[in-house]
């Protein structure tokens, strides 16, 4: 089980300056030394490097684009197999109701339970309906990861209206809820923890220096 506390997302995509499994492992080490209780990471290679560097539970994902589907976070059994090989403690996958490129969400959950019974599963959702569906399927954790990042939730931010969407999710499911997406300040982190989430994932505000720099520069340009 993931501990209560701060999970730091250590990810850099291929077009980003810090794209490197070695660099991500050092980013994870910095997070560990700062008090993080877990890491969220993308790709088998990054996860293996991170697990060699820090003794923390890892939420693993594989981001891969597919034609004719907007689902890209651990979209098929191929990505699941890569994550099982990485020996991450938790596999996270897109649990939205969008059209998937291959297996159904139900089939992927069954696949993970069969092939990796000791691995926990996290649902990345965008709506309360999707949270309820994930709970019905037996996900161990339900994360607000994709709220604001789908075509039908675009422009919505987790912290709007004092985290009302997060409150709605917490009231709708019995599963452990993870706050993720636009938790961008220590005060926001404290607020979501006080609301009763199991843990919170923070990424860009900690591990994306290019984006952090842009925010400082943008203030003067505005």
Swiss-Prot record:
UniProt-listed Enzyme Commission number(s): 5.1.3.9
GO terms of molecular function: N-acylglucosamine-6-phosphate 2-epimerase activity
Enzyme class: isomerase
Catalytic activity: an N-acyl-D-glucosamine 6-phosphate = an N-acyl-D-mannosamine 6-phosphate
Keyword terms: Carbohydrate metabolism, Isomerase
Pathway where this protein functions: Amino-sugar metabolism; N-acetylneuraminate degradation; D-fructose 6-phosphate from N-acetylneuraminate: step 3/5
GO cellular component: cytosol
GO BP, sorted A to Z: carbohydrate metabolic process; N-acetylmannosamine catabolic process; N-acetylneuraminate catabolic process
Recorded superkingdom: Bacteria
SUPFAM superfamilies (alphabetical): Ribulose-phoshate binding barrel
UniProt keyword Isomerase present: yes
Entry function: Converts N-acetylmannosamine-6-phosphate (ManNAc-6-P) to N-acetylglucosamine-6-phosphate (GlcNAc-6-P).
Family: Belongs to the NanE family.
HAMAP family on file: ManNAc6P_epimer
Protein name, UniProt field: Putative N-acetylmannosamine-6-phosphate 2-epimerase
Organism: Staphylococcus aureus (strain N315)
